[in-house]
Amino acid sequence: MKRIKKIIVNVTSVNLAAIDADAIVVPEFQHCALHSGIGITIAKTYPEGMQKYDYYAKAAGSSLGSVVVTETGSATCKHLLHAVILGCCREDLFACVKIAVEKALVLADENGALFVAIPTLGTGVAGYLSVEQSAKAVFAAVAEFAPFAKNIRRIDFAVSVSSVKVVEDILQQESYLDCETEIDGKKFGEWIYTLCNQLNSGVPEVSC
């Protein structure tokens, strides 16, 4: 746990959907992303918020690094903040996550959130970042946002149990500061992303 300006930042292994936050940042879920990881949890817990995002994405489209806010219909977590990072190239993903998280925090703050939960971003089957790199991007975004926060007073960063200590060390040692970009955390994200697209397009064969 660490205080950054007025915001308490906490590293937790609690399931993202079980965190009693006012708003939750989620990666944009498309294609096969909903069939694994936090995609299933969020879709089951906040189906209204996911359905609203699907409608918006089909009607208006979205650009990398942007964030879309949807209402969940829940009495506890009122908003999902959908960070559009899926499909970002390896070289730009760290910066894309950082930009999207900062935008998400601004939007959550504008909507009156006091408590925001954020998962690791860019680390899934279609991502390139390691958990450590994702943590640096998220914490860097929090540090840039914190001086301007009007409402947000707590941020929980949700990671796996095995990653808590290494991520907590990054937070305490402030190794995320002045970190502009990091690449090559994972090598297979591009192939997985291509596979997902081909499966959804009905292409029967995938070479690797």
Task: Indicate residue ranges for each PLM-predicted region.
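Phosphate/ribose-phosphate-bearing ligand recognition and processing surfaces
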Residues: L86-V206
